[in-house]
Amino acid sequence: MRVPFSWLKAYVPELESPEVLEERLAGLGFETDRIERVFPIPRGVVFARVLEAHPIPGTRLKRLVLDAGQAVEVVSGAENARKGIGVALALPGTELPGLGQKVGERVIQGVRSFGMALSPRELGVGEYGGGLLEFPEDALPPGTPLAEAWPEEVVLDLEVTPNRPDALGLLGLARDLHALGYALVEPEAALKAEALPLPFALKVEDPEGAPHFTLGYAFGLRVAPSPLWMQRALFAAGMRPINNVVDVTNYVMLERAQPMHAFDLRFIGEGILVRRARPGERLRTLDGVERTLHPEDLVIAGWRGEESFPLGLAGVMGGAESEVREDTEAIALEVACFDPVSIRKTARRHGLRTEASHRFERGVDPLGQVPAQRRALSLLQALAGARVAEALLEAGSPKPPEAIPFRPEYANRLLGTSYPEAEQIAILKRLGCRVEGQGPAYRVTPPSHRLDLRLEEDLVEEVARIQGYETIPLALPAFFPAPDNRGVEAPYRKERRLRELLSGLGFQEVYTYSFMDPEDARRFRLDPPRLLLLNPLAPEKAALRTHLFPGLVRVLKENLDLDRPERALLFEVGRVFREREETHLAGLLFGEGVGLPWAKERLSGYFLLKGYLEALFARLGLAFRVEAQVFPFLHPGVSGRVLVEGEEVGFLGALHPEIAQELELPPVHLFELRLPLPDKPLAFQDPSRHPAAFRDLAVVVPAPTPYGEVEALVREAAGPYLESLVLFDLYQGPPLPEGHKSLAFHLRFRHPKRTLRDEEVEEAVSRVAEALRARGFGLRGLDTP
């Protein structure tokens, strides 16, 4: 958020300097990313009035006759160049920061141009370069250096935390500074309203989407450029001035963190209707884009008789049809409180994030709509000559904040401080809280704009924040004999061991939020989450997660959107929340498998990830196998359950292709295991010094037979001297019988104390062959072609 120092100083006149302000805001919890000096306007730029504007035949240029203290002519190609406006004129010899060159006197299309009429970009005050910077024609005496009325500004770029939506308005920051002891000058709403009937009606069909909605009426407007002070403030805050009516709505939004919108009264019909969009409805928004509306979009509509038509996306952006124009004379002024979840979903659906939607998504003061109406209408009176109706149309009854018990003694105990009771109460009052009762227990009602104050601990935190965290005394913790935590620490040691082993195998650890989007339960074909948050930070963090793997998939998706890594190996150890809280380990593999020429392309990643798990469990000394099983979120032909020491602990497989397609992801393989893993005492065994004996075996089995079943059979029959078993070939096709496949294994035998004799190895292989035949399997080359 951009905070112009001079604008904030209008509310807090005692502010010493931008540097002191940065320090004060840091103590209040608002980090400054940078301090920027803007508007270095050269002395050679003066204010000028456009007396005449004549098109130059055969071109899109105009010859302007200006009064800049003396009559001068310039050539301009700006569409908005016209008689009766004020402009910024760069005289010959002026070096412009927005151009990086000096302005000269030139002949253009046979007209001598004495300088240059400037756009905001050319003047260096804004990014917009499509037209002249417009001022009221009487803003300054002609020829006055613009820098005298538009001095250099210092802007602080702040990080505002999600729990403080009120601080997205300068008045919210000013109130916090007031709590530090600075005097606060609240902006006045000197409104001269008239007792007039309103020429429109208000209907709200969706009170959940718009719990509080107000409409004001202003007429007799003179739409014109805003005065210099307002344009300077808006440019400094990062917004482009449009005209005095639209600029007032943006100015009050930046002041109070309360977005608002003005509708040209000629285009709303009989009144304003707040409803959900109809299927197939279309709306051209102010950015010129024709949008097809979604039935869940909350819209502001007008109506005539039985016909209703959309005027804007509620809380996001207005429609082009009802925007304020040069000839607008009357407006309906919307100031509302919308459901944050609804606004966020609409903004995301349409890829349309605006200053208004940003504030509505965080939440606005539920009681702030009427004061914002009065403030905006008073500015319209002052700047646009508006007449204002005293009455407001209002729908909804916002709920005032509830009182919170507060005990100063508890605050000191919680913080480890000894702040005086009177000082704590004074801080809460300076923050705008209403304090009732007597000590030791008070009842504190927070101001309606502080949506984050709900608990006694919130008030304690406010006391510490305003007093300054540096005033909390440092104290060494008390030292006690260390308890015997071996039983408690064991799971953490095992988790640390897992992390070390996976990192050694090339995996990268990630940390994701413990929250999930309830919509992900549908997207990933999971059971609905059991635990929903009452006050989530965002809709996509509204439930406690039930699995880890969706978070890993999201991490991969975000990285693929930014870059295109060839390969990714990710893992996470974290808590999930089902019938009870559990710790899980999840991993993800993305990218082509290597060293697996025998595997089908869709299986190579699966076998590679399975190999990583085999290596992991071999290092842990645990028996591991995978048995085929279908999971709704995994590829039905590439999935299985994971068994460790015979106990089912999780799953392994490829993400279901339909889910991958919905997320626009390439093939992804993943696993998730429940921790802690089954225990098995580790016994050290000397590496054998004796040579190994090798045999290859090709087993022919029906195609649906799971690999794990064959592997388990071979291991059991081979006896105690089988050291390792590796699948090195998978084949289907002639000359094998139809519906069969061949699995070829490397078998390695070794005795720990001596060299194995050939007859011992052959006996073990014979036992394997007999066990396979007894199960109905054959040996390739002996029992089958």
UniProtKB/Swiss-Prot annotation:
Family: Belongs to the phenylalanyl-tRNA synthetase beta subunit family. Type 1 subfamily.
Catalytic activity: tRNA(Phe) + L-phenylalanine + ATP = L-phenylalanyl-tRNA(Phe) + AMP + diphosphate + H(+)
Source taxonomy: Bacteria, Thermotogati, Deinococcota, Deinococci, Thermales
Residue ranges constituting the FDX-ACB domain according to the UniProt record: 688-780
Cofactor binding comment, as recorded: Binds 2 magnesium ions per tetramer.
GO annotation terms (biological process): phenylalanyl-tRNA aminoacylation
Organism listed in the record: Thermus thermophilus (strain ATCC BAA-163 / DSM 7039 / HB27)
Cofactor: Mg(2+)
Subcellular location: Cytoplasm
Key word ATP-binding present: yes
Protein name per UniProt: Phenylalanine--tRNA ligase beta subunit
Binding site for Mg(2+): 452, 458, 461-462
Database matches in InterPro entries: aa-tRNA-synth_II/BPL/LPL, B3/B4_tRNA-bd, DNA-bd_dom_put_sf, Fdx_antiC-bd, Fdx_antiC-bd_sf, NA-bd_OB-fold, Phe-tRNA-ligase_IIc_bsu, Phe-tRNA-ligase_IIc_bsu_bact
HAMAP family: Phe_tRNA_synth_beta1
